[in-house]
């Protein structure tokens, strides 16, 4: 049934365009209504069109992803989210992210027929939970992969390379200002 949905979308048949030109419904709802038109024999139950559409757009309904981590003498073990160390969780997430980014870039090159250098940004929130070694590993990985790393943390992270910026909010009277203070890396350059 999902193949029929993809076929209807790729064929861009006129009979379905009314769903995607209607500003009163969301894209998720349009997907659900398209799915219902193609599969009238399937009972959707009490679920809303929004819920059905979100399920259709959720990649987890199309992929079964298993990740293994190498644990020294124990060898390769299946990664369970609750049993991963912070470093393993970051590494697992990074490996998935990098594969997605690389496939997007390859597809973009294929479609456009041009070798455009992408702007590769990696965003990391809650960086205060990471130790210095984990942060250094992220910096090294981003440097090797030609990515820029943007970190959000409640305290300063002193980089060996690159620049960190501290945002300081100041209120004077009825006006609020944000001061940006930059700290340049102090590590040795090669």
From Swiss-Prot:
One of its GO terms (cellular component) is cytoplasm. GO terms for molecular function: DNA binding. GO terms for biological process: cell division; chromosome condensation; chromosome segregation. Pfam families: SbcC_Walker_B. It comes from the Bacteria. InterPro entries: MukB/SMC. It is found in: Cytoplasm, Nucleoid. The keyword Zinc-finger does not apply. Keywords: Cell cycle, Cell division, Chromosome partition, Cytoplasm, DNA condensation, DNA-binding. Gene3D superfamilies: 3.40.1140.10. Plays a central role in chromosome condensation, segregation and cell cycle progression. Functions as a homodimer, which is essential for chromosome partition. Involved in negative DNA supercoiling in vivo, and by this means organize and compact chromosomes. May achieve or facilitate chromosome segregation by condensation DNA from both sides of a centrally located replisome during cell division. The hinge domain, which separates the large intramolecular coiled coil regions, allows the homodimerization, forming a V-shaped homodimer. Homodimerization via its hinge domain. Binds to DNA via its C-terminal region. Interacts, and probably forms a ternary complex, with MukE and MukF via its C-terminal region. The complex formation is stimulated by calcium or magnesium. Interacts with tubulin-related protein FtsZ. Belongs to the SMC family. MukB subfamily. This is Chromosome partition protein MukB. It comes from Haemophilus aegyptius. The lineage of its organism: Bacteria, Pseudomonadati, Pseudomonadota, Gammaproteobacteria, Pasteurellales.
